[in-house]
Design a protein with these regions (language model features):
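PRPP-associated nucleotide enzymes
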Residues: 1-181
């Protein structure tokens, strides 16, 4: 049994469940993009890097990986404003694009990114997220989803609070007293 970090309430998704689902997603993506000359995968930093690394090791179609960094969260809350901190290294016009995110919360950041990338004329544009919060708002579309989770603050497997907890091998709920000032 995995020892629970003292700042956590509970493990929502354990390491074994994550690895099984990552393989399933990679198989689905590989099947859906079979015959494509090259899949251009965009990992959203920092949160998606662990998920992205595990996912791309299982994708069997030819692919390249690039990164973008966006800012929409402060230390504890969503600001509503999205900024591109790091952009792609090359044009994506005519490319088949897969955006890989760690979490879709409100969908605001992903929606912003989709609008930006659609303007760059890719051949296709798809999204993949490890987790999506169950909320009563219309979030951006996620074509390949790992897990739906409750609307709680989560950390682990790339997800963080103040850059901490990112390397935990599972996804867990963070105690509210940790992020409440």
């Amino acid at each position: 049994m995995t020892d629970l970090h003292p700042d956590l309430v509970r493990i929502l998704i354990d390491q074994e469940e994550i690895q099984k689902r990552v393989k399933e997603l990679a198989d689905q993506i590989s099947n859906d993009f079979k015959g494509v000359k090259r899949l251009y995968i965009i990992g959203i930093l920092k949160g998606a890097f662990i998920f992205l690394a595990d996912l791309t090791r299982h994708i069997t179609v030819p692919h390249v990986v690039d990164f973008m960094a966006l800012s929409s969260y402060g230390r504890t809350t969503e600001s509503g404003a999205v900024r591109i901190l790091m952009d792609l290294r090359e044009p994506i016009e005519g490319q088949h694009i897969l955006i890989v995110e760690d979490i879709v919360d409100t969908g605001h950041t992903l929606g912003y990114l989709l609008n930006i990338l659609e303007g760059r004329n890719p051949a296709s544009l798809h999204t993949c997220a490890l987790v999506k919060k169950q909320r009563d708002i219309e979030a951006a579309p996620v074509d390949y989803l790992g897990f739906e989770i409750p609307d709680v603050w989560v950390v682990g497997y790339g997800l963080d609070y103040a850059d901490l907890y990112r390397t935990l091998p599972y996804v867990a709920e963070l105690k509210s007293e940790v992020y409440s000032d």
